[in-house]
Amino acid sequence: PCFCGKTVGIYWFALYSCPGGYGYTGHCGHFMGVCCYPANP
């Protein structure tokens, strides 16, 4: 998992935005990818 502050999310490698269809409500940038949350949408 990854963290956006204290929020746990799912790390997506080599993406700069969250993939659709998972119900993500937000994200933050991480090294070589993006962290999308919530972790269990």
From Swiss-Prot:
What does UniProt give as GO cellular component? Answer: extracellular region; nematocyst
Q: Name one GO molecular function term.
A: toxin activity
UniProt xrefs under Pfam families: Defensin_4
Superkingdom is: Eukaryota
**Listed disulfide bonds for this chain?**
C2-C35, C4-C28, C18-C36
Coiled coil (UniProt feature): none
Location in or out of the cell:
Secreted; Nematocyst
Which keywords, in A-to-Z order, does the entry hold? Cleavage on pair of basic residues, Disulfide bond, Ion channel impairing toxin, Nematocyst, Neurotoxin, Potassium channel impairing toxin, Secreted, Toxin, Voltage-gated potassium channel impairing toxin
Name the InterPro entries for this protein: BDS_K_chnl_tox, Myo_ane_neurotoxin_sf
Q: Identify the main location.
A: secreted
Further comment found in the protein's record: Negative results: does not show effect on crabs.
Family the UniProt entry places it in:
Belongs to the sea anemone type 3 (BDS) potassium channel toxin family.
This chain's function reads: Potently and selectively inhibits voltage-gated potassium channels Kv11/KCNH/ERG. Acts as a gating-modifier toxin that shifts the voltage-dependence of ERG activation in the positive direction and suppresses its current amplitudes elicited by strong depolarizing pulses that maximally activate the channels.
Q: What is this protein called?
A: U-AITX-Bg1a
